[in-house]
């Protein structure tokens, strides 16, 4: 990955004076490949304020390179230059970890590797017993439907589409929220977001157009089991951070509460605050519930005539309690910055999920791993309980939503699964865990 970061301890030994590391992090077996990226001014303000209120800020590890890096596959990465066009954009510096940068260059020269771009898989094909996959059917760039035979099928199509492909292919029993039976589509979990924006005078230059996707400063004081939940009446937790990834001219427009939504006053406020504000977020954990699930839509279909995936979801009391608690704790950091104005963007009591505003793409569940085929779709190696030559890596395997973004653990779990495939399954195809 070329991850930039600062460890707190390595093999039980404190790294340096601990500055920049996360005191709540588990012990590491090795240092990060690269040192932490430089902090933006917004991150420096957050770090100073967090220290003042008694929290323990640390540099966010980021899959953006702080310097040149060559990974174990021989793939080369250049240093991130904080261009600000990171999230949602291809990196022209090769500074952002992704399969096309970190793995594909090593695969291309291999004689047994073929990449077929512009392909859309419609379903996994099963034999007459419905216990073995025979391949997949896909549509190519010319719109032709093609059947690709295969001895092994790996679904790595993002959380939503992994679940949809399993449902469309008849792999695993669909979840029924009324009876609680079935496994595919259950345990769908979101991410419980809260945001605070602090607005400053023109002499505080945060220059939000500068940024790197994963760079920032965070506190973990209220994440996971790092604090006593007892008095607060909820489970779960959240890191809080300033992650200045770059702010596009329109999407990044944000003005203090009370600013008119249009007209000359809005234009003036936009000019006054565009480069003089700090945005901080809590990316909170989210628990799965019986009534939050995924299934095939009975009405709406895609361009190929196949049912779309339907998401049935709403916030629950625990989610709102946790969210409001995080806003309160994060608000102390904002107040310590002494801004002109503060906007608190948290959930209200009784609030429902709103599909009109973007919140996060860090989704979990729907094809979860477990120890029992009656309650999970996959075993510990991400192998389907029902169709042994289908493996499904992705955040779809997580039964609950984490207090961190899932990407790092998705990658680790995928390597775990790939090793089991290579060292166990290919030598003796069949279930790797006996039900």
Which sequence ranges carry the predicted segments?
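Conserved redox-cofactor binding core of oxidoreductases
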Residues: 1-118, 359
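Short, glycine/acidic-rich hinge or "gate" loops at secondary-structure transitions
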Residues: 5-26, 340-351, 427-435
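Short, solvent-exposed loop/turn and secondary-structure capping segments
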Residues: 6, 62, 68-72, 126, ...
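Conserved, non-catalytic sequence blocks in retroelement Pol enzymes and Pol-derived host proteins
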Residues: 36-38, 94, 317-322, 357, ...
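A glycine-rich dinucleotide-binding beta-alpha-beta segment and adjacent secondary-structure elements
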Residues: 82-86, 122-127, 275-286, 291, ...
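FAD cofactor-binding and catalytic pocket of flavoenzymes
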Residues: 181-321, 360-364, 384-385, 392-399
